[in-house]
From Swiss-Prot:
Single GO molecular function: metal ion binding
Domain VOC residues, every copy: 6-129
Gene: yaeR
Gene3D superfamilies reported in the protein's UniProt record: 2,3-Dihydroxybiphenyl 1,2-Dioxygenase, domain 1
NCBIfam families: PRK11478.1
Keyword Cell membrane carried by entry: no
Record-linked SUPFAM superfamilies: Glyoxalase/Bleomycin resistance protein/Dihydroxybiphenyl dioxygenase
Protein name in the entry: Uncharacterized protein YaeR
Binding site for a divalent metal cation: 9, 57, 78, 125
Similarity section: To B.subtilis YwkD.
Length: 129
């Protein structure tokens, strides 16, 4: 048996490290656990935690190649975060000029959800518990 326990982290490459770090920490509520500038690669690496659990590895690299942006491009589609109150979460995001899609209802679970984007256009989802 392979023995997977849980997702350890998700790596995100940003075009502007400072902007993305501020978005994930100041707006979404992640905390910066550690940060290092790697001079040889002209690259930043930050480890971000959510509710005390390390979850995102945020990188910057000079001139990263673009990824396909069509809604159903092959590969990782989006990251989803659970929230207790989606209306309050959307209001918080919108107060920081983050545009959210209209809240929808999952026809299978009857739970409410919405999508928004990080500064580089990575789709993120809020899913009400």
């Amino acid at each position: 048996m392979l023995g997977l326990k849980q997702v350890h982290h998700i790596a995100i490459i940003a075009t502007d490290y400072a902007v993305s770090k501020a978005f994930y920490c100041d707006i979404l509520g992640f905390t910066l656990q550690s940060e290092v500038y790697r001079e040889a690669r002209d690259s930043w690496k930050g480890d971000l935690a959510l509710n005390g659990q390390y979850v995102i590895e945020l990188f910057s690299f000079p001139f990263p190649p673009e990824r396909p942006s069509r809604p159903e491009a092959c590969g990782l589609r989006h990251l989803a975060f659970s929230v207790d109150d989606i209306d309050a979460a959307v209001a918080h995001l919108e107060s920081h000029n983050v545009k959210c899609e209209t809240i929808r209802v999952d026809p299978y679970t009857q739970k409410r959800f919405t999508f928004f984007n990080d500064p580089d256009g990575l789709p993120l989802e809020l899913y009400e518990q």
